[in-house]
Structures are given as C-alpha cells and as structure tokens.
Regions:
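Glycine-enriched alpha-helix->loop->beta-strand junction motifs that scaffold or abut catalytic
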Residues: 37-39, 150-161, 195
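Catalytic beta/alpha-barrel core
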Residues: 18, 135-144, 159-171
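Flexible, acidic glycine-rich loops studded with aromatic residues
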Residues: 251-353
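Active-site-adjacent beta->alpha loops and helix N-cap segments on the catalytic face
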Residues: 24, 117-123, 141-155, 168-179
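Conserved, mostly hydrophobic/aromatic
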Residues: 44, 108, 139, 154, ...
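Active-site beta->alpha loop and helix N-cap motifs at the rims of alpha/beta catalytic domains
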Residues: 47-48, 54-150
C-alpha cells in the first residue's frame, strides 16, 4: 500500500484510477495499482477509444468475433468492453468483499447517445449489468434531466450506479434524491439493500478552465474547489434527513461523492491542487494515470474540507447565475465529447474489421 494513498484512506477517502485497457489488465498493471491502494476503476468512451487506438491487444478478439458472425461495430465494442470490465471487477472483487461491498467498483458507461433517452438508457443499463454479471460493477448514467429517472429505476432493481457529468449542485441534488427514491422502491425480499451502491461523479477541473476566463485573478483556480465544498454540504444535508435514516436502519448506504476530472488543466497550478483540497470522509477521488503517478511520488499536504471551504467568501467567489450557465454548457460539452469519442471508437473497430 502506497503511504500517500493510505493517508487519504485514513480520512475515509478512496482513490480510484480513471483508466482501463486490455493491456493494463493482461500485464498486471491494474493488479499492481490495486496493491498500491487503488480501490476502484472508472471508464468512459474516451478511455476505451484511446485503448483501441493505441493497443493491438484487442485485434485477435475482434477477428474471432467477426469470424463468429458478429459484424456490428457497436456489438463488437460491447463484447470487448464487457470482457475488460468483467476482468477488472474480478481483480477488485477482494477489495469489494473486504470493504463489505462499499468499495472496489468498476464503472462502465451507457452509450452516450442515449444520454437524453430514458427508456434506452434503462434498457442498456440492465443489459450491461446482466452481461458483466459481477456484484461490483457500476453503470454510469449521465446527470441529465432524462438520466434522473434512469438512476432511480436502476437502483430500484439493485443495480449500482455511477452518476457522471455532474457539474452543478442542482443536478447533484437531483441525482442524490433519485438514488434515495430508488432505494425506497427496492424489494428487500429479493435484493439485499446493503449491497446497492452509488457514487455521484462531480467534475472539478473543467469548471476552473471555463470560469477562470470570466472572473478576477484573485479567484482563479478557486471556484471548482468552492463548488465541490458546497456540493459536499448538500451531501451532508440530504443524507442526514429522516427519510434516509430509515434507509440506513435497513442497511442502505449513502451515495458517495466522487471527484472526477481532478488533474489540473492550467500548468501554473499545483498538480495536486484537486487532490490536496478535496479530502473529505466518504468520498472518492478518481485520478488519471499521470496524477496517480504524481501521488505515488509526492507527499500530500492535504487541507481539511473545512479549511478549503473557509478559504472562500461565498458572496465574492462567483455570481450563481453565471456559474449555472457555465455548468449547463459544460454538461452539453461533456456529452458531446463522449459522443465524439464513441463515434471514434466505432470507426476504429470498423477499420480493424475492414
């Protein structure tokens, strides 16, 4: 166990890796990361697109699939990604079991083209969950208005959910409440509520990238952390109410906030800015490989969330209306980026089978 990751674990923060590929699995790289303290994996279309472009480790399976009569690029991608996620789940299963089902998850995203189609998202979420057939898989659902009922439905069926592309506190609160509604609808005679989990992926650095363009210099590099501290206040409020206490008494768990997009985009910022200032109990920080390596080779001097929050004056940090416009735009941009990455990976598969 790496001492810096252990330091975060002692505050009850998990560190996940925001990367996966067939090569990482086959070479033992993911296993090594888990030995260092990584306790979960997140994936998205961009990650899979890079894996397919940069590795030849998928080529033999693609050939076998086409020879078996599967020529639809999306179906081929589903087969490839389902295998990767299933294999990764098996590597992390001991973590999941040791943590009593509260950690050790691997996330896979619903087709981003379904981000605004509730019915198709539910159908695909169920398909992926049943196909992977591992207790520690999480289905990623975008935090759109159409995604809110998807969260509730999948949770009610006992399917773990990672709510992704959350930029605004409003959408975070809606996703947390959808999770609670889903738990309330679980048939406890068929599903053990103790093993139904969710994380809410709250994006960080992309906010500063956009907000820094329109605010005073004194607040540059601060708004994303401030926004996260306010979301954490929302988390504490939502999961302390009486209706959730009833769920807790039945064995249910609070939805964890997961800090996503935590590598700095501005080269002038400390590389650990969104690690050291986002340490809070019952949270996750998912990091790309370069930030993971930075953590391994650095000494983390973290601030408590209370300290981070006290650094900012709510009235001066940013106008709420302006922030809401920016976070709404970031959601749309995020969806488009994932759609484009999905199109690119489908094109990559077409090229491999032609």
């Amino acid at each position: 166990m790496n001492k810096e990751i252990l330091k975060l674990n002692k505050i009850d923060q998990s560190v996940w890796i925001d990367s996966i590929s067939r090569g990482m699995i086959n070479t033992g790289k993911i296993k090594s990361m888990v030995e260092n303290g990584i306790s979960g994996i997140t994936s998205n279309p961009s990650i899979f697109q890079k894996a397919l472009s940069n590795e030849d480790s998928y080529d033999d399976e693609i050939k076998l699939l086409t020879e078996s009569g599967i020529n639809d690029p999306k179906k081929i991608f589903q087969k490839l990604s389902i295998k990767d996620i299933s294999d990764a789940c098996k590597i992390l299963l001991p973590v999941y079991e040791n943590k009593g089902g509260s950690d050790g998850f691997v996330s896979i995203e619903i087709d981003p083209k379904f981000s605004k189609d509730t019915d198709k998202s539910i159908k695909e979420g169920i398909y992926l969950y049943e196909s992977i057939n591992q207790p520690n898989v999480m289905i990623k659902v975008p935090g759109t208005s159409q995604g809110i009922p998807v969260i509730e439905k999948l949770i009610s069926l006992g399917i773990n959910v990672n709510v992704t592309l959350l930029f605004s506190r409003d959408m975070y609160r809606k996703s947390a409440k959808a999770y609670i509604k889903g738990l309330e609808k679980i048939n406890t005679e068929k599903t053990d509520i103790r093993y139904v989990n969710s994380v809410a992926s709250f994006f960080i650095s992309r906010i500063d990238t956009e907000v820094d363009k329109v605010i005073d210099n004194k607040n540059k590099g601060k708004v994303a952390i401030w926004n996260a501290t306010k979301a954490y206040e929302d988390y504490e409020d939502i999961f302390s109410k009486d209706n959730f206490k009833n769920i807790l008494n039945k064995g249910g768990k609070a939805q964890k906030l997961l800090w996503a997009s935590t590598s700095v985009k501005n080269p002038n910022y400390n590389k650990l800015l969104y690690v050291e200032n986002l340490v809070a109990p019952n949270t996750v920080n998912t990091v790309p490989e370069d930030l993971y390596n930075e953590i391994l080779n650095s000494e983390i001097n973290y601030s408590s969330f209370k300290q981070s929050k006290n650094n900012y004056d709510d009235s001066e940090i940013i106008d709420n209306d302006k922030l809401n416009i920016i976070t709404g735009e970031l959601l749309e941009v995020g969806i488009k980026l994932f759609e484009d990455a999905f199109d690119a990976l489908i094109k990559e598969i077409k090229n491999k089978i032609s």
